[in-house]
Amino acid sequence: MKLTHLLLAGLIGLTGCSPKVTQKEARMIELQNPILPGYFADPSLVQYDGKFYMYVTADPWGTDFLSCWVSDDFQNWTFHTLNWPTKAACTTPLSETNKVWAPSVVQKGDTFYMYVSDGSEVWCGKAKHPLGPWENALGNQPMIPGDTTRYYHVIDAEAFVDDDGKSYLYWGSGWNWTNGHCFAAELNDDMSSFRTKPVEVTPTRYFEAPLMVKHNGKYYLTYSEGKTIDETYEVRYAVGDNPFGPFAEAGNSPILKVNDSLRVYGPGHHTLFSYGGEDYMLYHRHR
């Protein structure tokens, strides 16, 4: 069976009720989806200087490089290959032949920081522009090495910058599509080392791809559950009063799942962004 990853965007609501989409908004979404047909997954989005920068895994299971798509209207996109990360630049004895995948990019001040998976390791890069040139923030070493633990998968790192300027990193998954674990720690100002010791913050029915957002003083930990290769994959969320929780799953979770009337599956590993006064979810799915 051919697997095609489709990157899509849709309106999203995290306020305890289902999102309401007007006819005008629905038409806009329909015209834009899918955004990138092909083998692209695990999107991360940055808005900078009037343009959208979408970072993606260039193949469903990782490649020797990562790519970035750029647009100023969210409809017409140009492809760019990044100088970092590459498998050659992100290799340790523990990463072996695993590829690079699942990029996550955040801006803090005048610097962009990227967190990327390679095997069961997390690497951190930095740049002054979304397209680079990028460099490894820690020389030739991973930020979270593969020997951290053998009980969970060290992948899918995502940074969150709070209103007070403090920054946090969330990451973690499970083995064999089960028993996902999510960890969090406050970051130092360099965004590539920890100020606090990592703690487990795993919410209900968590597997991978954590993403933190803040709304009206509450912390929303969004994440994927299930197998990315089948209809069990979906996006859920839980709410807490601080970046470390505890997090209680909301009543309208999941907020993204398979539509039984469509021949698609595996919607998830998302990112959230705001534009034009609306909040959107960007995600991949299989067809």
Placement of each model-derived feature along the sequence:
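Carbohydrate-active catalytic/glycan-binding domains of CAZyme proteins
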Residues: C17-R287
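Bacterial Sec-dependent N-terminal signal peptides
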Residues: M1-A26
